[in-house]
C-alpha cells in the first residue's frame, strides 16, 4: 500500500495518483523528463495552470504519506502565490523536490477509489459507488438484495447466507443478521442483532436482539434494550422497549411493552400496555410463563403475574396475580333500561 511504498523508498512524500478521462476540478501531477513527480498544479483558477498542464490526465488523489520533519520544514516555506491567494498543501511537493528530497507517486488503477467530494452532487455520486460495492460483496456471499437501488446497507453490517433484503430497507451501523432471514420491505435496522430465520417486514428496530425464527411486524417498533427470544412473535403495531419477550411468546397486535419481562409461551392480548412510569422513575412488569393475557389489559408496574395465570379482558392489573390464578380488575357490566328515552327527555322534553 501507500505507506509501505513510502517507507521502502525513504521518500519525503508519496502521493496517491490516478488517471481520469475527465480530470476537471482535480490538481494535475506534473512529471519531469525522467518521469519523476515534480509538482502538483491546482486548476481552481485559470491563472494557476497552463493549457498544457490542464491536458494532463494524471491527478492528485488527495492522500499523502509524509516524512513529518520534512513536512514541517516545507510548510514554513509555503507562500500564497496563486490566483486564490491561498496556501496549497500540494505545493509542499515542489518545495521538497527543489531540496532534492524524495518525491514519488503511488498510482491507483481504479479511479473511483479516489473520487473527490467538492459538493453534494459529488457526495451522492461517491456514496452510490460505495453502496454498490457493499451490495455486490453481500450478493456474491449469498445474500439476495431484491432492489439495490432502494436498499441502503452500511459498511459494517453483516448478513448471513440466503438472507433476503426486500426493497426500501435500511440496514445501519453494526447491524448483524444470521442466515435465511427475511428483511423488509420498508424495514429499518439500526445496530440490531437478528438470529437465523428471522422475519421482519415493515418494521423499525434499534439496538435490540431478535433470536432465531422470531417473527416481527408488520409495523413493529423495537427500541433499545429489547430482546425477542427464539420463535417469539411481535406483531402489528406493537412497540417494545427495554423488555425481554420469552421463547415462543406472542404479542400479536396493538400493544406497548415497556420495561417488561414476558415468559416463554405467554400470550399478551390485543390492546394491552405496561404502565411503567410513575412520573419520576420507571418500574418493571414481570409476566411469567404460559400466561394468558386478556385483551385491553393495563399492567401498572411494579406488578408480577405468575406462571400459568390468566387475566380477564379489560382488566387494570395493579396487584400481583398468583401462579395459575385468574386476575379480574373491572366493574361488572350493568344495563340501564330506558336510558335513551330519559336522556332525550332531559335534553329537549321529548320522548320516543
Residue ranges of each PLM-predicted region?
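Structural signal for interior beta-strand "rungs" in well-ordered beta-sheet cores
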Residues: 144-329, 333-334
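Long, low-charge, small-residue-enriched segments that form tightly packed helices used
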Residues: 330, 340-351
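Short coil/turn connectors at secondary-structure junctions
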Residues: 8-13, 24-26, 34-36, 60-61, ...
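Catalytic-core segments of class I nucleotidyltransferases/pyrophosphorylases
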Residues: 38-132, 136
Amino acid at each position: 500500500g501507500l505507506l509501505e511504498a513510502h517507507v521502502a523508498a525513504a521518500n519525503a512524500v508519496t502521493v496517491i495518483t490516478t488517471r481520469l478521462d475527465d480530470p476537471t476540478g482535480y490538481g494535475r501531477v506534473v512529471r519531469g523528463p525522467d518521469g519523476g513527480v515534480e509538482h502538483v498544479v491546482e486548476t481552481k483558477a485559470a491563472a494557476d495552470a497552463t493549457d498544457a498542464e490542464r491536458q494532463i490526465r494524471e491527478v492528485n488523489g488527495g492522500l499523502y504519506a509524509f516524512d513529518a520533519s520534512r513536512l514541517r520544514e516545507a510548510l514554513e516555506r509555503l507562500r500564497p502565490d496563486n490566483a486564490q491567494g491561498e496556501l496549497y498543501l500540494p505545493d509542499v511537493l515542489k518545495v521538497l523536490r527543489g531540496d532534492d528530497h524524495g518525491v514519488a507517486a503511488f498510482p491507483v488503477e481504479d479511479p473511483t477509489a479516489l473520487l473527490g467530494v467538492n459538493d453534494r452532487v459529488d457526495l451522492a455520486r461517491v456514496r452510490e459507488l460505495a453502496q454498490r460495492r457493499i451490495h455486490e460483496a453481500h450478493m456474491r456471499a449469498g445474500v439476495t438484495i431484491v432492489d439495490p437501488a432502494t436498499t441502503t446497507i452500511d459498511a459494517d453490517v453483516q448478513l448471513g447466507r440466503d438472507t433476503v433484503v426486500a426493497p426500501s430497507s435500511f440496514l445501519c451501523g453494526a447491524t448483524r443478521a444470521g442466515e435465511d432471514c427475511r428483511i423488509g420491505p420498508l424495514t429499518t435496522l439500526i445496530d440490531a442483532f437478528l438470529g437465523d430465520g428471522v422475519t421482519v417486514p415493515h418494521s423499525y428496530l434499534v439496538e435490540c436482539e431478535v433470536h432465531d425464527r422470531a417473527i416481527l411486524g408488520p409495523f413493529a417498533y423495537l427500541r433499545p434494550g429489547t430482546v425477542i427470544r427464539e420463535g417469539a412473535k411481535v406483531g402489528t403495531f406493537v412497540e417494545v422497549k427495554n423488555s425481554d419477550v420469552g421463547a415462543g411468546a406472542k404479542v400479536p397486535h396493538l400493544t406497548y411493552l415497556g420495561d417488561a419481562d414476558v415468559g416463554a409461551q405467554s400470550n399478551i392480548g390485543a390492546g394491552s400496555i405496561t404502565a411503567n412510569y410513575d412520573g419520576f422513575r420507571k418500574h418493571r412488569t414481570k409476566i411469567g410463563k404460559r400466561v394468558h393475557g386478556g385483551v385491553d389489559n393495563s399492567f401498572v408496574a411494579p406488578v408480577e403475574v405468575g406462571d400459568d395465570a390468566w387475566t380477564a379482558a379489560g382488566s387494570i392489573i395493579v396487584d400481583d396475580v398468583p401462579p395459575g390464578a385468574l386476575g379480574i380488575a373491572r366493574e361488572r357490566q350493568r344495563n340501564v333500561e330506558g336510558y335513551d328515552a330519559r336522556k332525550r327527555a332531559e335534553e329537549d322534553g321529548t320522548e320516543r
